[in-house]
Amino acid sequence: MPHLTRRSAMLAAAALPLAASLPAGAAAAQPLQGAAFPAFTRSRLGGFEVTTLLAGTRPMDKPQETFGTNASPEDFAALSQANFIPTDRSLNFFTPVLVNTGAELVLFDTGLAPEGITTALAAAGVAPDQIDIVVLTHMHGDHIGGLTGDGGPTFAKARYVTGSAEHNHWSGAGDKGFDSKVKPLNDKFTMLDDGGVVVSGITAMAAFGHTPGHMVWHLESGGQRMMIAADTANHYVWSLQRPDWEVRFDADKAAAAAARKKVFGMIAADRIPFAGYHMPFPAQGYAEPAGEGFRFVPLGYQLML
């Protein structure tokens, strides 16, 4: 039986008038605001600043129909359970990356629409007309959607860079998004091949498969390195731990799987961080070899020191 001391009895008695004076329901007066993420994170890579920008999120039902089309339901459920994520629902992130080289502001991809990327940039203290270069990793709508809006180009003073094979493919594809978002800017584009240089310290690397000319981009400054991995892996568990699982959006599924193994094999071997467009925000981490694939290790404070 609990023992009531004289001191605890006095404290309880003192609290009674306060409790009586509170209106009914006062404890629930603050409305719930819902789950939220920050709009940006900024870190250092040698002499560069790297800012990830959350341009949007989108929940998805039946994720196996997107991220594991050749996996059995049992295997998909088992891997999901092992990683503490639901089997029947997922959350997709859309995360462009801004690199400040000290001389230029280089933006990788633009999100679904101008509103998402400009809002994230504003939170990071950057205006759209400050962007010097926009690099497009590939031409899917969630990467080119922020290029233009009703008022014209979002990044009025920028020049544009993308892969030659990617631009060539979409130029003849009759794609509405490409024709409306990219073609009007064609005279401002520079096309690069594997090994091409955007500016000093930013180099193109072919990772074809997700699209016919999908590229990743290697950053290096002051002896530090990072990979902008774009859509090489579309999910931090299903695509990384099982690189052979097919993704609905991959144009060439065998080539995409080979690209995942090649790119993340290099990232893991060299122990360098990467930014992945659809990774959980802030969308940066490391790839650790694990069985047939890789385990995503979220970035901590390594680039804050």
Kindly label every feature range from the protein language model.
Residues 61, 89, 105, 111-187:
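Active-site HxH/HxHxD metal-binding segment of metal-dependent hydrolases
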Residues 134-144, 208-214, 276-281:
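Histidine-centered catalytic micro-motifs
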Residues 3-5, 223-305:
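Cap/insert and terminal regions of metallo-dependent hydrolase folds
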Residues 30, 126, 130, 155-206, ...:
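Metallo-beta-lactamase
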Residues 39-123, 216-232:
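Conserved beta-strand hairpin/beta-sheet module of binuclear metal-dependent hydrolase folds
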Residues 55, 110-112, 139, 165-166, ...:
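Active-site metal-binding loops of divalent metal-dependent hydrolases
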Residues 1-20:
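N-terminal secretory signal peptides and thylakoid transit peptides that target proteins
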Residues 47, 109, 138, 160, ...:
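Divalent metal-coordination and catalytic microenvironments
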